[in-house]
From Swiss-Prot:
Reactions that this protein is recorded to catalyse: ATP + H2O + a folded polypeptide = ADP + phosphate + an unfolded polypeptide
Family matches, as InterPro entries: Chaperonin_Cpn60_CS (IPR018370), Cpn60/GroEL (IPR001844), Cpn60/GroEL/TCP-1 (IPR002423), GroEL-like_apical_dom_sf (IPR027409), GROEL-like_equatorial_sf (IPR027413), TCP-1-like_intermed_sf (IPR027410)
Protein name: Chaperonin GroEL
Subcellular location: Cytoplasm
SUPFAM superfamilies in alphabetical order: GroEL apical domain-like (SSF52029), GroEL equatorial domain-like (SSF48592), GroEL-intermediate domain like (SSF54849)
One Pfam entry name: Cpn60_TCP1
Complex and partners: Forms a cylinder of 14 subunits composed of two heptameric rings stacked back-to-back. Interacts with the co-chaperonin GroES.
Organism ancestry: Bacteria, Pseudomonadati, Pseudomonadota, Alphaproteobacteria, Hyphomicrobiales
General function of this protein: Together with its co-chaperonin GroES, plays an essential role in assisting protein folding. The GroEL-GroES system forms a nano-cage that allows encapsulation of the non-native substrate proteins and provides a physical environment optimized to promote and accelerate protein folding.
């Protein structure tokens, strides 16, 4: 076991604070509309330029083990806020630094760290309640665009694109962000349910120019197992042929005699047909087939529920207005499912999302939810260089996350203003002087984001904060972009409540733990062994 080095008391806290300050000082220059960029060196490829707080925090690793502990604890504040709200990481870092700085001073003045923590926790609870009380629900597409624009650092085109995407696929819809191959940023919306399985044979193609299968008003056979035997499939094929409608078969696989017959049938101009593999694997495949059945008002043909393929009637098949099948994807547009049944299925998936502890399962459930509830939108971020595209993609990701958070819990004025107002309204009392001091730490720390935004814009922070607090209106604040005092909400300067709340809660949680630290243990760095000396002397009889 390697030897350990131990630091105690004031010495330990000072080293922690030094690490916190190094990380926070690198991150906080990015805060606000006039925040600066940070350039991050990469071991391969071009350096990365970003204004995203968590991206900067994740790159910082300090040489001194004790200082690094402080930096990593503060990095956790940014990461946790990013996981919960997807934005507000820089605000969380600034708040965390302010709470640690004030807390270390209080502990140095012989106050009880545990009582300080209790005071901090009580104050945070009161501030969060105040934020919820003042929150304004988002109703219009314009308000969604405003939130997205602020988080994208004032880029109105990004704000409008995200608002359009949310309008088209709904609040539950999946919106993904990808890097484009061109210089333009564009939005592509896939309506209906799409899954990543294409046609099993190119002979099914109806549009040879685009190599697509287009089926209008088809029946949809949803089968859980493999289809290889033709005899069991014949009754369904005959019934569909008599109706004159096309047929889409979704099954685990279609092979052998069954596939050959379907292809020959299509080539002879008999039945307009296509077959695709079922999406997903195992239990997830079963669930997705059920989703397709609900969406198209069909039934999953499965021997588990006692339905044999030879007994299937047309009433058991799903219906849709259109189906498009490419080499790699299948899209079902405007399924015939009952709205009430689809809503019940959506509620069931939402309940599963709440219960799951696996991030992977949650992501897959959200994908299923989106496919049922609305559709999928893809924002392709373009730019002239790879560095520009990556920087822009960071901003689009932040804007998208902030917008989702705003729809969920509502909005408050931006620019750190609600935290300033909450500090003024913080009237709770502690049970003893040390708890009072903990409440005071939060009261002072709440000013830090607004001060940092002003400082990054080259303004005198104390003057800006003073003028904002002189006005009694909750929505009055300072617009750093235009250097004007005004009603922030009417000008679209807003922040999602979820972002502000998560930033404060996570900052206080980690910072109060740092304050209560009394000892630190780290491994003693190993001394590098000196390289062996080169053997002396040259080769005999050789002159150089």
């Amino acid at each position: 076991m390697a030897a350990k080095e131990v630091k105690f008391g004031r010495d330990a806290r000072e080293r922690l604070l030094r690490g916190v300050d190094i990380l926070a000082d690198a991150v906080k220059v990015t805060l606000g509309p006039k925040g600066r960029n940070v350039v991050i060196d990469k071991s391969f490829g071009a350096p990365r330029i970003t204004k995203d707080g968590v991206s900067v925090a994740k790159e910082i690793e300090l040489e001194n083990k004790f200082e690094n502990m402080g930096a990593q604890m503060l990095r956790e504040v940014a990461s946790k806020t990013n996981d919960i709200a997807g934005d507000g990481t820089t605000t969380a870092t600034v708040l965390g630094q302010a709470i640690v700085q004030e807390g270390v001073k209080a502990v140095a003045a012989s106050m009880n760290p545990m009582d300080l923590k209790r005071g901090i926790d009580a104050a945070v609870e009161a501030v969060v309640a105040d934020l919820f009380k003042k929150a304004k629900k988002i109703q219009t597409s314009e308000e969604i665009a405003q939130v997205a624009t602020i988080s994208a650092n004032g880029a109105e085109d990004i704000g409008k694109m995200i608002a359009d995407a949310m309008e088209k696929v709904g609040n539950e819809g999946v919106i993904t962000v990808e890097e484009a191959k061109t210089a333009e940023t564009e939005l592509e919306v896939v309506e209906g349910m799409q899954f990543d399985r294409g046609y099993l044979s190119p002979y099914f193609v109806t549009n040879s120019e685009k190599m697509m299968v287009d089926l209008d008003d088809p029946y949809i056979l949803i089968h859980e197992k493999k289809l290889s035997n033709l005899q069991s499939l014949l009754p369904v094929l005959e019934a569909v042929a008599q109706s004159g409608k096309p047929l889409l078969i979704i099954a685990e696989d279609v092979e052998g005699e069954a596939l050959a017959t379907l292809v020959v049938n299509k080539l002879r101009g008999g039945l307009k047909i296509a077959a695709v593999k079922a999406p997903g694997f195992g239990d997830r495949r079963k669930a997705m087939l059920e989703d397709i059945a609900v969406l198209t008002s069909g039934q999953v043909i499965s021997e588990d529920v006692g339905i044999k393929l030879e007994n299937v009637t047309l009433e058991m098949l799903g219906r849709a207005k259109k189906v498009h099948v490419s080499k790699e994807t299948t899209t079902i547009v405007d399924g015939a499912g009952q709205k009430s049944e689809i809503n019940a299925r959506v509620s069931q998936i939402k309940a599963q999302i709440e219960e799951t502890t696996s991030d992977y399962d949650r992501e897959k459930l959200q994908e299923r939810l989106a496919k049922l509830a609305g559709g999928v939108a893809v924002i392709r971020v373009g730019g002239s260089t790879e560095v520009e595209v990556k920087e822009k993609k960071d901003r689009v990701d932040d804007a998208l996350n902030a917008t989702r958070a705003a729809v969920e819990e509502g909005i408050v004025p931006g620019g750190g203003t609600p935290l300033l107002r909450a500090a003024k309204a913080l009237s709770i009392k502690g049970k003893n002087p040390d708890q009072e001091a903990g409440i005071g730490i939060i009261r002072r720390a709440l000013q830090a984001p607004a001060r940092q935004i002003a400082h990054n814009a080259g303004e005198e922070a104390a003057v800006i904060v003073g003028k904002v607090l002189e006005n009694c209106s909750d929505t009055f604040g300072y617009n750093t972009a235009t250097a004007q005092f005004r009603d922030l909400i009417s000008f679209g300067i807003v922040d999602p409540v979820k972002v502000v709340r998560s930033a404060l809660q996570n900052a206080a949680s980690i910072a109060s733990l740092l304050i209560t630290t009394e000892a630190m243990v780290a491994e003693v760095p190993k001394k590098e062994a000196a390289a062996p000396a080169m053997p002396g002397g040259g080769m005999g009889g050789m002159d150089f």
